[in-house]
Amino acid sequence: MHQRALLFSALLTAVRAQQAGTLTEEVHPSLTWQKCTSEGSCTEQSGSVVIDSNWRWTHSVNDSTNCYTGNTWDATLCPDDETCAANCALDGADYESTYGVTTDGDSLTLKFVTGSNVGSRLYLMDTSDEGYQTFNLLDAEFTFDVDVSNLPCGLNGALYFTAMDADGGVSKYPANKAGAKYGTGYCDSQCPRDLKFIDGQANVDGWEPSSNNDNTGIGNHGSCCPEMDIWEANKISTALTPHPCDSSEQTMCEGNDCGGTYSDDRYGGTCDPDGCDFNPYRMGNDSFYGPGKTIDTGSKMTVVTQFITDGSGSLSEIKRYYVQNGNVIANADSNISGVTGNSITTDFCTAQKKAFGDEDIFAEHNGLAGISDAMSSMVLILSLWDDYYASMEWLDSDYPENATATDPGVARGTCDSESGVPATVEGAHPDSSVTFSNIKFGPINSTFSASA
């Protein structure tokens, strides 16, 4: 979808390299946030955001010939992973007109459909604008405002962290010449195989175009790392979910050994694709979150997440608060028999898996301890997407599809099972959007007033 009339030539400096293009200037939209040291003492940070490399125009280093069109690689430019990486460049982005991404001070708005583009995924850059901003979440608090009033069933306006490399993988994989400036290095607990480039090489080998998405496919390789989903939500449902992995750093996997959404064996990889989720509706509290409910999704809200550590400094509890209309509101309590509390702990996760009859893959990958080591350096991700694999039913409807809705853990929200089908939501709600703003980070109880 990105054709350009300009031409240029480039000298290849490596046999294998993930190149940076120059046909479109890359200018990161600015976004401010606040670093707090004590309650009421916060300092503004001048950051910016960058769009993920998977959304970018990928073309020949010698001219504007597409390396990737629709969901297919050019066979001449990309006969294999290494040749493709040497032949192809990631180019700059026009954030607003192409991707529907706008910023204003401390506010970031992501529009759902802009022209032929659907959704977006962005990373917070550091103040130098050279690498990703990293956060040590242990014994810390992360707070933001969000407006989900324009996010219907089937959409997910997500704010989360993963253990990406701060430089986008450049130091580990010198063949990666694009780096964080061009949004490289993504990884998560699904070990996604739809990435066009991983570890400085293309993902051409074994690439299979998607049968239901004209823009995507999956390759032989995936990119794995621990993931902390602070916020996956629309105006009907929300979930808070840690996902541990066996390694605290980004790793590349191959084929079905990746596990996750993109593989035949969901639990065959080194990460937990399910995580231990706290969705108030799924936990039996159907009056807590939604339009006109305790947390009214018709209005902007403040979301506070605290990462509590034990005496050894390891993550032991994840707590959630909301602030709306001047009121501090604790997370909903579980109403599921045998599962107590309103925070994520080891005991909560064990009891929840048992009550819902779910495989405890979370514990198999060492639970909270399995994500704790990664939390000393995580990258902030903000995205808006629809779900070509499960129509977002796992977030806002009944899931799995063949389960009985009245069984514990099956109902996750009030959305109809067909409402999240991508063709439906893209056709009916292209003007949907989410706005994140007022991001704050600091020690426990430093980013909001408990007596608000």
Curated annotation (Swiss-Prot):
Keyword list, A-Z: Carbohydrate metabolism, Cellulose degradation, Glycoprotein, Glycosidase, Hydrolase, Polysaccharide degradation, Secreted, Signal
Matching SUPFAM superfamilies: Concanavalin A-like lectins/glucanases
Active site location: 227 (nucleophile), 232 (proton donor)
Leader sequence segment: 1-17
Pfam families in alphabetical order: Glyco_hydro_7
Residues modified by glycosylation: 62, 285, 335, 402, 445
Induction (UniProt): Expression is under the control of the xylanolytic transcriptional activator xlnR.
CC terms in the record's Gene Ontology section: extracellular region
Family per record: Belongs to the glycosyl hydrolase 7 (cellulase C) family.
PANTHER family: 1,4-BETA-D-GLUCAN CELLOBIOHYDROLASE A-RELATED, 1,4-BETA-D-GLUCAN CELLOBIOHYDROLASE B
Known function: The biological conversion of cellulose to glucose generally requires three types of hydrolytic enzymes: (1) Endoglucanases which cut internal beta-1,4-glucosidic bonds; (2) Exocellobiohydrolases that cut the disaccharide cellobiose from the non-reducing end of the cellulose polymer chain; (3) Beta-1,4-glucosidases which hydrolyze the cellobiose and other short cello-oligosaccharides to glucose.
Protein name stated in the entry: 1,4-beta-D-glucan cellobiohydrolase A
Record organism: Aspergillus niger
